[in-house]
Amino acid sequence: MATLSPEKFSGSPISISKEFPQQKMREIILQMLYALDMAPSAEDSLVPLLMSQTAVSQKHVLVALNQTKSILEKSQELDLIIGNALKNKSFDSLDLVEKNVLRLTLFEHFYSPPINKAILIAEAIRLVKKFSYSEACPFIQAILNDIFTDSSLNENSLSI
């Protein structure tokens, strides 16, 4: 995978303002996860594309790219958790949007500052409704409920 650094676009370090909506950031990250799953070599063109398509600044898109890379680094671990929670379905049979919504949500749960589980589930459902099909919402909610209530999995059980 090609690497993209902020220096490629500007000489200043990246900082994100508190005013940037977290919902919008999740949408951009989800789009990046999807795009990089479809074409891993497309990273260099992803930043300008998302800047034009989402009307978001370069700084925020680069922050999203950094978060996306962090999720991809943990994807094997996250995929294992998702796969273990599936009862009558294989991980490979999941739609790509569903996989990436689950990865994003679980990454936020296990590797980010604490966020209420109900908020994470609501955000996952919102993303599925926006980027996939609403019929998948109960399935996503059930998977996340199973994972969040599994006592063997908690924020401290994964390697950070």
Swiss-Prot record:
Xref: Pfam families: NusB
Molecular-function GO terms, alphabetical: RNA binding
A biological-process GO annotation: DNA-templated transcription termination
Signal peptide: none
Lineage: superkingdom: Bacteria
Role, per record: Involved in transcription antitermination. Required for transcription of ribosomal RNA (rRNA) genes. Binds specifically to the boxA antiterminator sequence of the ribosomal RNA (rrn) operons.
UniProt-listed NCBIfam families: nusB, PRK00202.2-5
Record's protein name: Transcription antitermination protein NusB
Source organism (scientific name): Chlamydia pneumoniae (Chlamydophila pneumoniae)
